[in-house]
Design a protein with these regions (language model features):
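Helix-adjacent hinge/juxtasegments
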Residues: 51-54, 58-99
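Conserved beta-sheet core of the metallophosphoesterase superfamily
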Residues: 49-51, 85-131
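Catalytic metal-binding/acid-base residues of hydrolase active sites
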Residues: 13, 39, 54-56, 80-82, ...
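Active-site-proximal beta-strand elements of phosphoester/diester hydrolases
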Residues: 5-11, 73-80, 120-125
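Core catalytic region of metal-dependent phosphoesterases/phosphodiesterases
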Residues: 2-71
Length: 131
């Protein structure tokens, strides 16, 4: 069985050409996930699982999305919902409440991959405004 490919981006902040560019660079993705602050219209994100970020003022994207790939339950949420103090604890708690294994989030513009107590935290950073 072929392993599923999940393509994740975040915080493109209105650079809409980047959304298409990512798909061009990764045409064989099984899932395309945007972790918020796309600042895109809904129609632009048709093929994406996309959540609302703190700069997506006019979007009707959901605050969170859950999806399952093989035996893993994923939660997508923009990182501003986790605060700044005890951020990691808040992320783990949110995963536990949602009965998920992996959190895909954005907001900080800083890439991160961390495994904590059996949970996985992933932030792809920003495709256009990295820090």
């Amino acid at each position: 069985m072929k392993m599923k490919k999940i393509v994740v981006m975040s915080d493109s902040h209105g650079y809409h050409q980047m959304i298409n560019r990512v798909k061009e660079l990764e045409p064989d993705g099984d899932y395309y996930v945007h972790c918020g602050d796309s600042e895109a219209e809904t129609y632009m994100m048709q093929d994406w699982l996309c959540v609302k970020g703190n700069n997506d003022w006019y979007s009707d994207f959901p605050n969170q999305i859950k999806f399952k790939v093989e035996d893993l339950n994923f939660l997508v949420a923009h990182g501003h919902r986790f605060g700044y103090m005890d951020r990691e604890t808040s992320m783990i708690y949110t995963l536990q409440e949602a009965n998920c294994d992996v959190l895909l989030s954005g907001h900080t513009h800083v890439p991160m991959y961390k495994e904590v107590d059996g949970y996985t935290l992933i932030n792809p950073g920003s495709t256009t405004l990295p820090r």
